[in-house]
């Protein structure tokens, strides 16, 4: 590994962490944690799935996801129903109030980020657009 690659990895990691922190603070009155919001967003985007599938998608251990789902269910943000094929399983889906929470959180983050992006010229916004695609590619391809 070249020193420049190590520096890029360090700089990129720091930038992503700082951006995540800024986005996290855009909706401080949210009743859910970031891990709960992430699980809700996945369910809203991808539809109902088993807790095990959601744990894999969120890259957490199944017991951790079980706790996340239980707390979201207690707050009324997810619904659980029997699996149509495997009676031992349940399917978890986002409830109406959970979907509204995801939309509100997404809107708050997007409003802040659009405001910040508009301070950049179009060339810099294009660079960020390409970088976002590359970051997602890196994440999706990682084990």
From Swiss-Prot:
Residues 5-137 form the HTH marR-type domain. Pfam families: MarR. It comes from the Bacteria. Keywords: DNA-binding, Transcription, Transcription regulation. InterPro entries: HTH-type_Bedaq_tolerance (IPR052526), HTH_MarR-typ (IPR000835), Tscrpt_reg_MarR-type_CS (IPR023187), WH-like_DNA-bd_sf (IPR036388), WH_DNA-bd_sf (IPR036390). Residues 51-74 bind DNA. GO terms for molecular function: DNA binding; DNA-binding transcription factor activity. Homodimer. This is Uncharacterized HTH-type transcriptional regulator ML2140. It comes from Mycobacterium leprae (strain TN).
């Amino acid at each position: 590994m070249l020193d420049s690659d190590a520096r890029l990895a360090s700089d990129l990691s720091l930038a992503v962490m700082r951006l995540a922190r800024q986005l996290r603070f855009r909706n401080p009155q949210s009743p859910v944690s970031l891990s709960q919001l992430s699980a809700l967003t996945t369910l809203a985007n991808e539809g109902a799935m088993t807790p095990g599938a959601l744990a894999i998608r969120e890259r957490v251990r199944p017991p951790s996801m079980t706790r996340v789902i239980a707390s979201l269910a207690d707050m009324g943000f997810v619904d659980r129903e029997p699996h149509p094929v495997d009676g031992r399983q349940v399917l978890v889906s986002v409830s109406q109030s959970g979907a509204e929470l995801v939309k509100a959180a997404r809107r708050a983050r997007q409003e802040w980020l659009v405001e910040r992006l508009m301070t950049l010229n179009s060339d810099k916004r294009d660079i960020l657009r390409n970088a976002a695609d590359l970051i997602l590619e890196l994440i999706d391809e990682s084990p």
